[in-house]
Curated annotation (Swiss-Prot):
Compartments where located: Plastid, Chloroplast
Entry keyword set: Chloroplast, Plastid, Ribonucleoprotein, Ribosomal protein, RNA-binding, rRNA-binding, Transit peptide
Quaternary context: Part of the 50S ribosomal subunit.
Name the record gives this protein: Large ribosomal subunit protein uL24c
Family: Belongs to the universal ribosomal protein uL24 family.
A GO CC annotation given for this chain: chloroplast
GO biological process, one term: translation
UniProt cross-references to InterPro entries, sorted A to Z: KOW, Rib_uL2_dom2, Ribosomal_uL24, Ribosomal_uL24_CS, Ribosomal_uL24_KOW, Translation_prot_SH3-like_sf
Organism: Pisum sativum (Garden pea)
Length: 194
C-alpha cells in the first residue's frame, strides 16, 4: 500500500516535471514502517520555508507605502561628491528621492539618453541627463571656507531648529537661503509655463 502511494506520488511529480526527491529544497523521504508498529506508517514532519531573494524584498510600511529615509541634505544645499567617478566635483542639489536615499546634483553624473524620433522626417536626439547619486556619496560643502563638513543640528535663541556645518559653524538653514530657493523655484516654474 505504501509502495503504491509512493508510485502514484512519483508519477504525479513526473507529470508536473518536478523532481520526485525534493520539494522546495526539502528532501522527500518515503513513509517508513516502524518495526515496532507493524502495519501503521510513521511520518516525519518537516517545516518547508521559502526565503525571498534579496532583490524581491521591498521595505514597506504596514499600509504598503514605501519607507522614506531621512537624509542629511536638502534641496538647494551645496555639496561635494566624495566618492565615485565624479569625486571632487561641487554642485547644488536639485532633487531628492527619499525612498532610495538618492539625490540629483546639478551638472554632475551626466548620462547620455538616446531618444527616438516621433515623426519620420525628424531625426533622433542624444540628450545629457543628470543621474541620481546615493546621498552617502555627497557631503555638505562651505563655499566661504572651501571645506566639506558633516551636518549638525542646534536650536537657536528664538526656538528655531537649524542645520549647521560642524567644521565651520556656518548655519545652512537661514531664512535668506530659503527665500532665494523659493524665488529660483518660482522663476523655473514661470519659464516652464511659457
Amino acid at each position: 500500500m505504501v509502495a503504491m502511494a509512493m508510485a502514484s506520488l512519483q508519477s504525479s511529480m513526473s507529470s508536473l516535471s518536478l523532481s520526485s526527491n525534493s520539494f522546495l529544497g526539502q528532501p522527500l523521504s518515503p513513509i517508513t514502517l516502524s518495526p515496532f508498529l507493524q502495519g501503521k506508517p510513521t511520518e516525519k514532519k518537516c517545516l518547508i520555508v521559502m526565503k525571498l531573494k534579496r532583490w524581491e524584498r521591498k521595505e514597506c510600511k504596514p499600509n504598503s507605502l514605501p519607507v522614506l529615509h531621512k537624509l542629511h541634505v536638502k534641496v538647494g544645499d551645496t555639496v561635494k561628491v566624495i566618492s565615485g567617478h565624479e569625486k571632487g566635483q561641487i554642485g547644488e542639489i536639485t532633487k531628492i528621492f527619499k525612498h532610495n536615499s538618492s539625490v540629483i546634483v546639478k551638472d554632475i553624473n551626466l548620462k547620455t539618453k538616446h531618444v527616438k524620433s516621433n515623426q519620420e522626417g525628424e531625426p533622433g536626439q542624444i540628450n545629457k541627463v543628470e543621474a541620481p547619486i546615493h546621498s552617502s556619496n555627497v557631503m555638505l560643502y562651505s563655499k566661504e571656507k572651501d571645506v566639506t563638513s558633516r551636518v549638525g543640528h542646534k536650536v537657536l535663541e528664538n526656538g528655531k531648529r537649524v542645520r549647521y556645518l560642524i567644521k565651520t559653524g556656518e548655519i545652512i538653514d537661514s531664512e535668506e537661503n530659503w527665500k532665494k530657493l523659493k524665488e529660483a523655484n518660482k522663476k523655473t516654474a514661470e519659464v516652464a509655463a511659457t
